[in-house]
Amino acid sequence: MKKLDRIIVALDQMSLDEIDQFLKLKDNNLPFVKIGLELFVKYGPDLVHKIHREYQKKIFLDLKLHDIPITVERSIASLKNLPIDFLTVHLGGGVPMLKAAVDEARISIPDCKILGVSFLTSLEASDLESLYGITNTDEAFLRLFKAASLSGVDGIVSSPHEVALLKKHFPKLLSVTPGIRFQDEIDSTKVQDQKRVMDPAEALKSGSDFLVMGRSLTKTSRFSERMKSLQE
């Protein structure tokens, strides 16, 4: 797989016009985009169909479903025949919920992979301890990864710092990693919304299968330069 094929660009905090302008950029040959909760609530399935039809992009629908099993099952059923490649659910929903998600996805969106979200990249170790009493983060992540494996989930969404742990114990699970920023952004302390971050080259070396990048690509005035660096 080419390096650019492993980059998923998050279309977060963008208007329809901004999305169109970005996807029409001359050097934008990124094949995969992410539509998050905000955009999906605002524009619904029409946005998914539009991007798939007009730009032939693969689509990661990042809804992070987390509810009782029947509600998650019916929510996925409502996505029937939507042209999506990835869909997220929260691993914290437990094995019954995860199995319900996987089973319904095989029926309603059979070409879509179900990804389990571990802990949000906006949380760091101190947050996990204060919220959940977690003092051993590796053990906490492994419990979630095990639930994913038992449930038939296709992959894991986690920060790049957990990828080595995932691949060591569950190598067959895909690793999709947000929290990816260019090194100069990390060095300049411009990263505020995510705490467990890494640059693209390092994340790929750690074993990530797909990298999720947002404003580093969508809000930059150096897009062509950034694209070249991703291909090096």
Segments (PLM) and residue ranges:
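Conserved anion-binding
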Residues: 3-7, 67, 71-75, 80-155, ...
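Conserved, mostly hydrophobic/aromatic
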Residues: 9, 33, 64, 87, ...
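Glycine- and other small-residue-rich loops at beta-strand/loop junctions that grip anionic moieties
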Residues: 11-12, 36-40, 68, 89-90, ...
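Conserved alpha/beta-domain cores
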Residues: 11-55, 69-72, 165-167
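Short, acidic/polar
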Residues: 13-25, 70-78, 137-147, 194-202
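Generic structural signal for well-ordered alpha-helices
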Residues: 19-23, 48-49, 76, 95-102, ...
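Structural motif
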Residues: 28, 54, 82, 151, ...
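Glycine-rich phosphate-binding active-site loops on the catalytic face of alpha/beta enzymes
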Residues: 82-94, 193-226
